[in-house]
Amino acid sequence: MSEVTHRTKTRPVKVGPLTIGGNNEVVIQSMATTKTHDVEATVAEIKRLEEAGCQIVRVACPDERAANAIADIKKQINIPLVVDIHFDYKLALKAIEAGADKIRINPGNIGRREKVEAVVKAAKEKGIPIRIGVNAGSLEKKILDKYGYPTADGMVESALHHIKILEDLDFHDIIVSMKASDVNLAIEAYEKAAKAFDYPLHLGITESGTLFAGTVKSAAGLGAILNMGIGNTLRISLSADPVEEVKVARELLKSFGLAANAATLISCPTCGRIEIDLISIANEVEEYISTIKAPIKVAVLGCAVNGPGEAREADIGIAGARGEGLLFRKGEIVRKVPEETMVEELKKEIDKIAEEHYAKMEAEKAKANA
């Protein structure tokens, strides 16, 4: 293939109840930071990720203790569980048997062909996919010897090698990631991969850094990739609470119109005209809407003169003035509210719009099932 395979044209792959690929949705993932064998801590963290909007979660499986915990974890969570395996095919078999919704392996590094065959056979029987995880930092020696250092071509060659191992065993429920910590390398690798095969792509800039630096780096790299129509699922990798990964992912997808059920905040950068504590209000509203699963655009603006006009596209918003605020919908002023209650009034209006959306969705669902 010489053209980029758009995300809508990729091969659909089921992960639990979700479909990755074959549509325009980009599914948000994260990874638990807990020791997987600590079931209570792992489940608690996954529950926080679920609440933040994470749709798929991955856990490490470095040993038998971790593998033995998978079944208990799976029973207590509501989103698909991916198990990350390196080298030991027996751990992959245990994870599959325990109910993993997907496993992440590189077929070429778990041993002889019969070991790969055993994993593929188990995955087929359970109907679960395999993610091939190519990483610029851990390319095979023969590829590094060939190219001299990690390159996009080398990463694609590695991916195709692992894909062929699975395809030769008549296994096609495959998702591929092409991660690198270098932004330009990642962009090039994903673009070349999207031209080389039509399997769904899991996006990520690996080892991107701390909350601030990693957010900027991930947004720069993944934004460029998403803008090419590439990517079916993604994880923002941060040295931070994984809930922050989900928040950043949601904001990134919203920026490209790829998050259908997420609220968006518009807020002004402030200037000498503002008469309210806009920064703290904007932060409070942003936190409030972070878990709302409805396509609501909310505005928080500091100037009552220009505010409503500037946020004409917002569903609901407030513009501050001295001692009061203007509450408006679609750019039209609804009413004036006292400054001390304007945030609470805004929250009430947000809730109303969200409830209207939920009711509409339920009605459409009922009609479709009738």
Curated annotation (Swiss-Prot):
<keyword id="KW-0479">Metal-binding</keyword>
<keyword id="KW-0411">Iron-sulfur</keyword>
<comment type="pathway">
    <text>Isoprenoid biosynthesis; isopentenyl diphosphate biosynthesis via DXP pathway; isopentenyl diphosphate from 1-deoxy-D-xylulose 5-phosphate: step 5/6.</text>
</comment>
<feature type="binding site">
    <location>
        <position position="271"/>
    </location>
    <ligand>
        <name>[4Fe-4S] cluster</name>
    </ligand>
</feature>
<dbReference type="GO" id="GO:0141197">
    <property type="term" value="F:4-hydroxy-3-methylbut-2-enyl-diphosphate synthase activity (flavodoxin)"/>
</dbReference>
<dbReference type="GO" id="GO:0016114">
    <property type="term" value="P:terpenoid biosynthetic process"/>
</dbReference>
<dbReference type="GO" id="GO:0051539">
    <property type="term" value="F:4 iron, 4 sulfur cluster binding"/>
</dbReference>
<keyword id="KW-0004">4Fe-4S</keyword>
<dbReference type="InterPro" id="IPR004588">
    <property type="entry name" value="IspG_bac-typ"/>
</dbReference>
<feature type="binding site">
    <location>
        <position position="303"/>
    </location>
    <ligand>
        <name>[4Fe-4S] cluster</name>
    </ligand>
</feature>
<dbReference type="GO" id="GO:0019288">
    <property type="term" value="P:isopentenyl diphosphate biosynthetic process, methylerythritol 4-phosphate pathway"/>
</dbReference>
<dbReference type="InterPro" id="IPR045854">
    <property type="entry name" value="NO2/SO3_Rdtase_4Fe4S_sf"/>
</dbReference>
<keyword id="KW-0560">Oxidoreductase</keyword>
<dbReference type="Pfam" id="PF04551">
    <property type="entry name" value="GcpE"/>
</dbReference>
<dbReference type="InterPro" id="IPR011005">
    <property type="entry name" value="Dihydropteroate_synth-like_sf"/>
</dbReference>
<dbReference type="GO" id="GO:0046429">
    <property type="term" value="F:4-hydroxy-3-methylbut-2-en-1-yl diphosphate synthase activity (ferredoxin)"/>
</dbReference>
<keyword id="KW-0408">Iron</keyword>
<dbReference type="InterPro" id="IPR016425">
    <property type="entry name" value="IspG_bac"/>
</dbReference>
<protein>
    <recommendedName>
        <fullName>4-hydroxy-3-methylbut-2-en-1-yl diphosphate synthase (flavodoxin)</fullName>
        <ecNumber>1.17.7.3</ecNumber>
    </recommendedName>
</protein>
<dbReference type="GO" id="GO:0005506">
    <property type="term" value="F:iron ion binding"/>
</dbReference>
<feature type="binding site">
    <location>
        <position position="268"/>
    </location>
    <ligand>
        <name>[4Fe-4S] cluster</name>
    </ligand>
</feature>
<feature type="binding site">
    <location>
        <position position="310"/>
    </location>
    <ligand>
        <name>[4Fe-4S] cluster</name>
    </ligand>
</feature>
<comment type="similarity">
    <text>Belongs to the IspG family.</text>
</comment>
<comment type="function">
    <text>Converts 2C-methyl-D-erythritol 2,4-cyclodiphosphate (ME-2,4cPP) into 1-hydroxy-2-methyl-2-(E)-butenyl 4-diphosphate.</text>
</comment>
<keyword id="KW-0414">Isoprene biosynthesis</keyword>
